[in-house]
Amino acid sequence: MKPLLKENSLIQVKHILKAHQNVKDVVIHTPLQRNDRLSERYECNIYLKREDLQVVRSFKLRGAYHKMKQLSSEQTENGVVCASAGNHAQGVAFSCKHLGIHGKIFMPSTTPRQKVSQVELFGKGFIDIILTGDTFDDVYKSAAECCEAESRTFIHPFDDPDVMAGQGTLAVEILNDIDTEPHFLFASVGGGGLLSGVGTYLKNVSPDTKVIAVEPAGAASYFESNKAGHVVTLDKIDKFVDGAAVKKIGEETFRTLETVVDDILLVPEGKVCTSILELYNECAVVAEPAGALSVAALDLYKDQIKGKNVVCVVSGGNNDIGRMQEMKERSLIFEGLQHYFIVNFPQRAGALREFLDEVLGPNDDITRFEYTKKNNKSNGPALVGIELQNKADYGPLIERMNKKPFHYVEVNKDEDLFHLLI
């Protein structure tokens, strides 16, 4: 991709600078930190823009607050509406309370109680939360109907020039804080609001900086739209990287990204999980899946960034501790260390012992075993999870299984079966 190095008509540097004046006394000027571990690993200078330390633990406050700050007195009196199950809802709720504007926040009925409570906390006394529908489309429809019926203003999570300009204030801070020339900037793309603002500012103030968009491989709405030359809607997505998993990128954000993005990278969800765990264990950074996307993409650019100055936007840190086990599981599977099998065991004494003694390697560990004895049958299936110490142990494990009279199916290699059982 070759971006057009000029301002587009939708969002310009002057809009971002105005937004910076509007939000600077409300949002936290988050730190830009050189990360020694990552810098050593990739033989370059890696800087993390820590939006996980923002007051609502994500960049979303910037765009929501700036948008609401632009409202007329009539719009302020009528109130606002948003549809979100995550960080945008928190940003709108905080802005409602700070600006004294009443807001109605529509969230899916399936939203975890913890997220609902966080939104309530940020907007206490100034918001009503309406839980409705099972999907974002249901929620969006209800929010739109409320806007029309009550003459409220809809605060879009990304496809709005004021929101995009607000998110771009993050780039103002980056260039003010960095003590050298940034050669690369990596940031996540979901709806596209963040990188539309950040990319616009960088391409006009630091035009030699390469702007790299990063998407989850299971929700590549921008990548597919870029390939098609127009916005497309994905049939299905993997919702794991929830802060960046959208079926359709914004129309306005797509137009803007096409003028500022140098490359688009797709990162498998399992790799994202590995990066989340490494950031936590090695750097004491609590990143949500979308927040870890930028760091997770570095392996794909390790040759290009060697010896360079690289900024990674850690876009948020609203991570549910209850998801950590799933993240560890996805990471192990991606790294080739966790494997699942359906093994058809002979229903005779000693069959399991034979499997343990003659199939498992000395460093292999059974992490899951589900077996129900079948009466009047000579064999019975069991779901077996095996964690390897080294990826290279997989081949010998399969060789040993093939030598024994155990018929088996590798669950990892059957996506439908995997999602059904695991």
Curated annotation (Swiss-Prot):
Signal peptide positions on this chain: none
Regions that span the bilayer: none
Cofactors required: pyridoxal 5'-phosphate
Binding site for pyridoxal 5'-phosphate: N87, G190, G191, G192, G193, L194, S315
EC nos: 4.3.1.19
The reaction(s) this protein catalyses: L-threonine = 2-oxobutanoate + NH4(+)
SUPFAM superfamilies documented for this protein: Tryptophan synthase beta subunit-like PLP-dependent enzymes
Modified residues (N6-(pyridoxal phosphate)lysine): K60
Positions of the ACT-like domain: 339-413
Keywords: Amino-acid biosynthesis, Branched-chain amino acid biosynthesis, Isoleucine biosynthesis, Lyase, Pyridoxal phosphate
Keyword presence, Amino-acid biosynthesis: yes
Subunit relationships: Homotetramer.
Function summary: Catalyzes the anaerobic formation of alpha-ketobutyrate and ammonia from threonine in a two-step reaction. The first step involved a dehydration of threonine and a production of enamine intermediates (aminocrotonate), which tautomerizes to its imine form (iminobutyrate). Both intermediates are unstable and short-lived. The second step is the nonenzymatic hydrolysis of the enamine/imine intermediates to form 2-ketobutyrate and free ammonia. In the low water environment of the cell, the second step is accelerated by RidA.
Protein name listed in UniProt: L-threonine dehydratase biosynthetic IlvA
Organism: Bacillus subtilis (strain 168)
Gene: ilvA
